[in-house]
Amino acid sequence: MSDLHGHLPNPEQIEKVDVVVICGDIVPLKIQRASMFVDEWLRNEFKEWIQLLPCERVILTPGNHDFYFHSAPRTKLEDTLNHVGKKLVYLEDSSYIYKGVSFYGCPWCTGPLGWAFCPGNSMLFHGVYKEIVTIEDMYNKIPECDVLLTHQPPSIENLGTSFHWDKARAKDWGSDRLRVHLKDKNILVNFSGHVHSGDHERILYPTLGCDTVFYNVSIKNEQYKVAFQPRYILLNKEDKTIIEMGTTKMITLD
């Protein structure tokens, strides 16, 4: 799932799985720029939710609304993550292997200046003011892996197309450069979010020169209302197959 923006789905309505993946924008909108309140939220509501989820691991990469993860000094961030507990695995340009399945998380996005994990602007990055490197530098770090978590989707068909209220306003917010970097890479599945109203169906893109399966797993729409259910898949690493176990069909809005 992705783009929770503070909404924590009822754990009793989540099916039992091995791993839950979250592709960013978890922090409530109303406090997203208030580090003290975000830290408190992570240590309390978020921690309790993580512990109640019916899974063994929760693997998270942040998004452009998650300013706390971008700006907090690394020692502070590590302390907060340790407080949440070992069940949560935080991936920021880093890898993790669970039961032989490799995961990599890339939070970086192409986008306007002033947002978290958007290169090209001078801002507080883990407690130090610095000029953020280019998006290519961050994409170059992406290795071959079984499961790739990116906040922004690659520009592939309508995966990152925002339709808002009508197709006349459609715009592709996917990353062309991410699509180029994924070309010919051996990645089984790429989960992303960022664009709430992007195509949530299974997408294949054979012209990319790979067999990667792409999913937009945001759970909110462009009006920040819960609109999609979590996506469930069964990944069989031995024969490189992905079986869909559930859908993200539109649900009744609040």
Located regions from the model:
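Binuclear metal-dependent phosphoesterase catalytic core
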Residues: I97-K99, V180-K185, H196-D254
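Short, electropositive alpha-helical surface patch
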Residues: A72-Y90, A168, D172, I203-E222
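Core catalytic region of metal-dependent phosphoesterases/phosphodiesterases
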Residues: G6-Y98, G174
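Binuclear metal-dependent hydrolase catalytic cores centered on His/Asp/Glu-rich metal-binding motifs
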Residues: V101-V147, K167-R177
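Active-site neighborhood of phospho(di)ester-bond hydrolases with catalytic His/Asp-centered motifs
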Residues: M1-S2, V20-D25, R57-N64, Y90-D93, ...
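Active-site environment of divalent metal-dependent phosphoester hydrolases
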Residues: H5-N10, V27-I31, N64-A72, S95-I97, ...
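Active-site-proximal segments of metal-dependent phosphoesterases and phosphodiesterases across multiple
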Residues: V27, I31-R43, E144-N186
